[in-house]
Amino acid sequence: MKRIAVISLLAATALLGSCRFVTIKDSESSLSKGVSASETTRKADEEKIVNRYDVGEFDSVVCSGAFDINYNSGSCEVKVEATERDMEGLKVYVEDRTLHMEFTKKNLLGKKSDIDVYMRSDTLNSLEINGAAEFDSHGGLKAGKQFNLTVNGASDIEIDSLEAEFIRINTNGAADAKIAGINASELNIQVNGAADIRLAGKTVSTQIEINGAGDIDTSHLQSESFSKRVNGRVVR
């Protein structure tokens, strides 16, 4: 009799050892089999962190990547908000008064990301954007004698006011730019590709060259002298 009881107990123990228990708290709870851990990891990957960069003085910017850039005039400052994953391989540095923002080879230039950049400088004389970035300067920007804007790729540019003696704009690709409050002696625009550019303000002289399916709206731009060489469309 004791032998039967011992055998039964051993069998029950073996059965219990082979069972896999799943705890269900309620209809809104997750199963306790690793799902909550993966959800926690995913949420951690989605949470943004803030990095501030002590880069020194700069008056030119070169950005290569899918950034969402907010620019204002003021003391030089660079702040980046992104997930830890998107921060990987990000390089931010100043060389010869030019702020560079770029990724290492481990990251793709135009990969989908959600990287918010907040930057300030006393003046901005040159801006170059490579990739599918967004650049907004709702407070406008101050330039020196000359301002150069170069856009390579499908970036969106919005500048509320821009003042310089000479302004040069060069786009290659499907750029979308809206620049208002222009105050310049000379404005020179060269478009290669399918850019969509809207301009407003005042200039003494304006020269436009389009190669491709570019579309430039200058209906709100006052200019004493206007010349164009176009293989595209200019709305005047």
Task: Show which residues each predicted segment covers.
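Intrinsically disordered, low-complexity terminal regions
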Residues: 1-236
